[in-house]
Swiss-Prot record:
Belongs to the peptidase M24 family. SPT16 subfamily. Gene3D superfamilies: 2.30.29.150, Creatinase/methionine aminopeptidase superfamily, Creatinase/prolidase N-terminal domain, FACT complex subunit Spt16p/Cdc68p, Pleckstrin-homology domain (PH domain)/Phosphotyrosine-binding domain (PTB). Residues 99-124, 479-509, 638-659 form a coiled coil. This is FACT complex subunit SPT16. Residues 957-991, 998-1017 have a biased composition (Acidic residues). It is found in: Nucleus; Chromosome. One of its GO terms (biological process) is DNA replication. It comes from Kluyveromyces lactis (strain ATCC 8585 / CBS 2359 / DSM 70799 / NBRC 1267 / NRRL Y-1140 / WM37) (Yeast).
């Protein structure tokens, strides 16, 4: 049955509710009743028994709900809104000997709710003093706060004995019906598909030697569940596995846990393992695990991928395959004791490979279903009353950890996990079918024999060593121009080779990232988003002054009211397009144009239309009104124009704030001493006055508190911080802690993504005379005679200030529990550039390129950069431009203009060192056009060669260069939509002023015939002169 989007199988609800109601008396401890209290949803722990009970009975979790089971009936206490979904179930129990009662709470009547709780407690005490509850469950919420005091008092008053019923619940729902088996098949097939995706990503990363961490790789897989194109393909595979009366619903597909990737020498074979931040290590073994759940039914799969394995590794993996097969086929039998299964497994290992016994996992699996890991159904050495039974589902997981290869000394691990379902006759079948054959999971990238042969060959082909010059020689290595040039050319060749590999990798990644499904259908029409609005709901809302049959502008309702045939007709301002006013003779004509489908001005760039196209709809495109009252018509036209401007401005503000995410609340630190940093200025500031405030570190974030008002503060959560920077006062007048956010936050009505805390590094005061008596002066150390001491004091102050800020930045990172890491710029690697309106000093950090001194700030995360283009690189120009294109194609490109040409070689080297491919262009490119074509069809873009259209001669800018005078800078497009920062203020600055080249005219005067030899010719002549010289002194 479906009600408001919630579909409940009431037959399954009846069967399961009565099953538990009649079976609980046989639970351990013989409870007289069962009680389940669920408060707010706990997304951090979705596997609590009460939550699972709700999912088992209803298919959903009903927050703020109590469920109680008695000998002859069950009682559900919930809100009236939820009760309407459950009331149809009551009729199912009318002919049964087990009844259902639903008691409705009233959020506005506390006394009524209290009476319901007291009646329930009375029923519990009347049925007996032993109450079964899942004692490990923990929930929060308003209902818990209301219930808990009454319950604690009732336990004392009625001498209630509370026992744990968790094991009994597990035994009740461990057997799966046909519908539950279908859900498990769907989730297992989903796990197979995601494992296939994981294996492709892992092998590609190892093959391409990508620098990616285990956690980043797992995050990439985890985010794929939100990829609509991938889910569309997945749906067609999973739909046939659904129950016959259901269709696959992607909204019920979710992760049972975050995917896990483990490599290197650190392996954790427990279900609680997590991907670490170490780089993916492409040698030995890589463990990959993922689990999908569908309609809350879980599945699990783990595979080991062997990279260039030794014989010992493959032998141990083959033994693991045999061991898993033995457990599933021979030991997992109905009525078998889980402890016996584990002991027989250990005996088999001791018999075949005793050296692996100490490395074996502490269990080989557990019950699985709505609960990912049911502790009551563990298969380990611990004795349990649980027995293997038909229709159960198990996660069979086993492996050997902390193994050390005897040949190479490398630490590795092997592990396998599969979802196994027992049928009604007790026969096990493996639901996760992704391959685990050694031939399919072993990959060889480095052949040792080939490497040795190549090494011998290279040694044989080496030229004989040249005799070293002795100490009496007049020819020194650094004296010859040719030798210096040879070194530079060698470095350049290395850089070119590295760039070639980076471009090849970029092309391969592009083809892998985008498939045919990403290509936009040429016949597909662009999607329009239709604005929904209405001026008035009822006719009585129309202003009374419209009776004069004149044009009126209702600012409150954003409406133009026009008199048509003696009736006031409202037109919402969103329907108004533009208008004009003309005077002809004694009449003033007012023409109003309205939006309509197919009308001019509604082009491809229009993202929103005021109407939905429908052939049955009729539209007014324009109206012309005339009047002899010219002043009145002018005033009306002005009001309409102003109203349209206000509406447009409001819509632009709404779009600008569309990506603002509402943050969770900051949890203040109420235990221990709160770390703080005083006398801090903030940019941007919530106050109009410039006053220093205080920064506090709390449990889940930091807070800046202004001294002017208690509500004047900025809260920043650790989870929303993307980058945390510390910049010392070296070479600057301020010391900085800078926070770059993942999602912008609001400060007043302004959207901000960068927040900076700083303090001035020096307070300058100068005594120009130096003749005053020192003891009588306020600033007694500021005389000329103490200038050296003053400088030393200045250095000490700066060092102390840097130390204080650095410690506080590290304290922020430490309080984030590993979410953040402090990054600092390398000043020696910095260069001048113009990312916005003025020249600033840009500096690389470990992960970013930043400029934090002068707003607007610049933060470019290097791992998000797809490619860098160096523009206007020509002979005769003193500077060039940099353009960063991001992997997220929807993100505008970032420009850094007017970089000194002397920095070109250094920047090329730096880009190569951080694995960013670059190309060189002699002109400014039209990035709005390039990015639009790339966004429209990225798959075809990479099929056509990707960024190779820019790479021709990209690192040989001296070839085919023109020496004619060109403009140093031209905007790439009139529409600055590809710029990262743009405002109307930029119009005050002319391009000539911002990007002028003072020396460019030097190359324009005179013809080419008048010029002397270029630098290349002069270098050749000098080298020839060196060779002809006898180097005599």
């Amino acid at each position: 049955m479906s009600d408001g989007g919630i579909e409940i199988d009431f037959q399954a609800f009846y069967d399961r509710f009565t099953k538990l109601g009649k079976a609980y008396s046989g639970f351990e401890g013989s409870p007289n009743s069962l009680l389940f209290v669920l408060g707010s949803t706990n997304e951090e722990n979705p596997y609590q028994k009460t939550t699972i009970l709700h999912n088992w009975l209803l298919g959903y979790e009903f927050p703020a709900t109590l469920i109680a089971f008695f000998k002859d009936k069950g009682v559900i206490i919930t809100s009236s809104a939820k009760a309407k979904h459950l009331l149809p179930a009551v009729t199912k129990f009318e002919g049964s000997d087990y009844k259902l009662e639903i008691w409705q709470r009233n959020n506005k009547d506390a006394n009524h709710n209290k009476k319901l709780f007291e009646d329930l407690i009375k029923l519990l005490s009347e049925n007996g003093n032993t109450v079964g509850v899942p004692t490990k469950d923990s929930y929060q919420g308003k209902l818990i706060l209301e219930w808990k005091p009454l319950w604690e008092e009732a336990k004392k008053t009625h001498s209630l004995n509370v026992i744990d019923c968790s094991a009994g619940l597990s035994s009740t729902w461990k057997g799966k019906d046909d519908k539950e088996k279908a859900y498990l098949s769907v989730s297992s097939k989903g796990s197979d598909k995601f494992m296939d995706l994981m294996s492709n990503e892992i092998v590609n990363a190892v093959d391409e030697e990508l620098k990616i961490s285990n956690s980043k790789l797992s995050d990439k897989i985890e985010n794929k569940i939100d990829d609509s194109k991938f889910l569309k393909k997945l749906s067609s595979d999973l739909n046939p596995l659904c129950p016959t009366d259901e269709k696959f619903d992607v909204n019920f597909l979710d992760w049972a846990y975050s995917p896990i990737v483990q490599s290197g020498s650190k392996f954790d074979l427990k279900v609680s393992a997590r991907s670490n931040n170490d780089s993916l290590f492409g040698k030995g073994s890589i463990l990959a695990s993922c689990g999908i759940r569908y309609k809350n039914y879980c599945s699990n799969i783990t595979r080991t991928f062997l990279i260039d394995p030794t014989d010992e590794m493959t032998d141990n993996y083959d033994f693991l395959l045999i061991l898993q097969e033995k457990i599933i086929d021979d030991l997992l039998k109905v009525e078998a004791d889980p402890t016996s299964i584990y002991e027989k497994t250990l005996e088999f290992i001791k018999e075949k490979k005793p050296e692996l016994l100490s490395h074996f996992t502490k269990n080989v699996g557990s019950l699985m279903g709505l609960e990912f890991r049911d502790s009551a159904g563990m298969i380990n050495a611990k004795p349990t009353a649980h027995k293997i039974s038909e229709n159960c589902c198990y996660n069979i997981s086993l492996g050997f950890g902390n193994l050390k290869d005897s040949k190479t000394g490398q630490v590795y691990a092997v592990q396998l996990a599969d979802t196994v379902q027992l049928s009604s006759d007790g026969k096990p079948s493996t639901l996760t079918k992704y391959t685990k054959a050694r031939s399919q999971i072993s990959f060889y990238f480095n052949n040792e024999e080939e490497n040795k042969a190549a090494t011998v060959k290279s040694e044989k082909s080496k030229p004989p060593a040249l005799p070293k010059p002795d100490g009496t020689s007049k020819i020194l290595r650094s004296k010859l121009r040719g030798e210096s040039r040879a070194d530079d050319e060698e470095k350049e060749q290395i850089r070119k080779e590295n760039q070639r590999k980076l471009h090849e990798r970029l092309q391969k990644e592009g083809l892998l990232r985008y498939s045919d499904a990403d290509a936009v259908d040429g016949d597909e029409k662009p999607k329009h988003f239709f604005k929904k609005y209405e001026s008035y709901v009822r006719e009585t809302q129309i202003p009374s002054n419209v009776r004069d049959l004149k044009i009126h502008v209702d600012w409150k309702s954003q409406t133009i009211i026009l008199p048509i045939y003696g009736r006031p007709v409202p037109f919402h301002i969103n329907s108004y397009k533009n208008g004009s006013k003309n005077e002809e003779g004694e009449y003033t004509y007012l023409r109003l144009n309205f939006h309509s489908p197919g009308a001019g001005g509604v082009g491809k760039k229009t993202e929103e239309l005021p109407y939905e196209e429908n052939p049955e709809n009729q539209f007014v495109r324009s109206l012309t009104l005339r009047s002899k009252d010219g002043a009145r018509m002018s005033d009306v036209f002005k009001q309409i124009t102003d109203l349209k401007k206000e509406s447009t401005k409001r819509e632009q503000e709404r779009k600008a704030l569309a990506d603002v995410v509402v943050q969770a609340k900051l949890v203040e630190n109420k235990t221990g001493r709160t770390k703080r940093l005083d006398q801090i200025f903030v940019r941007p500031s919530p106050d109009t006055k410039r006053v220093p405030g205080t920064v506090f570190i709390h449990e889940n974030g930091i807070r800046y508190q202004s001294p002017l008002r208690t509500d004047s503060r900025i809260d920043i959560l650790f989870s929303n911080i993307k980058n945390l920077f510390f910049q010392s006062s070296k070479g600057e007048l301020i010391v900085i802690i800078h926070v770059h956010l993942k999602n912008p936050i609001l400060m007043g009505k302004k959207k901000i993504q960068d927040i900076q805390f700083y303090r001035e590094a020096s307070d300058m005061a100068v005594d120009e005379t130096g003749n005053s008596r020192r003891n009588n002066m306020k600033f007694r150390r500021y005389g000329d005679e103490d200038e050296l001491e003053q400088e030393q004091e200045e250095r000490r102050k700066r060092a102390a200030l840097d130390k204080e800020f650095r410690y506080f930045a590290e304290a922020i990172a430490e309080a984030s529990d590993g979410l953040l890491d402090v990054d600092s710029p390398f000043r020696d690697l910095g260069f001048q550039g113009v990312p916005s309106r003025s020249a600033v000093f840009c500096m690389p950090t470990r992960d970013c390129l930043i400029q934090l001194v002068e707003p607007p700030f610049l933060v470019i995360n290097l791992n998000e950069v797809e490619i860098c283009i160096l523009e206007r690189v020509q002979f005769g120009l003193k500077n060039f431009d940099m353009v960063f294109v991001y992997k997220d194609l929807t993100k505008p490109v970032s420009h850094i203009n007017t970089v000194p040409i002397e920095q070109l070689e250094f920047i090329k080297t730096w880009l190569t060192d951080v694995d960013i491919p670059y190309t060189v262009s002699t002109i400014n490119l039209n990035w709005s056009t390039i990015m639009k074509s790339l966004q429209d069809d990225p798959h075809q873009f990479f099929l056509d060669g990707g960024w190779s259209f820019l790479a021709t001669g990209s690192d040989d800018e001296r070839s085919d260069e023109s020496e004619e005078e060109i403009s140093e800078y031209e905007a790439s497009d009139e529409d600055p939509s590809d710029e990262e920062v743009y405002s109307e203020e930029e119009e005050d600055y002319s391009d000539d002023e911002k990007f002028s080249d003072e020396g460019s005219d030097d190359f324009a005067d005179g013809s080419e015939d008048d010029e002397g030899d270029d630098w290349d010719d002069l270098e050749k002549k000098a080298a020839k002169a060196d060779r002809n010289s006898n180097y005599k002194e």
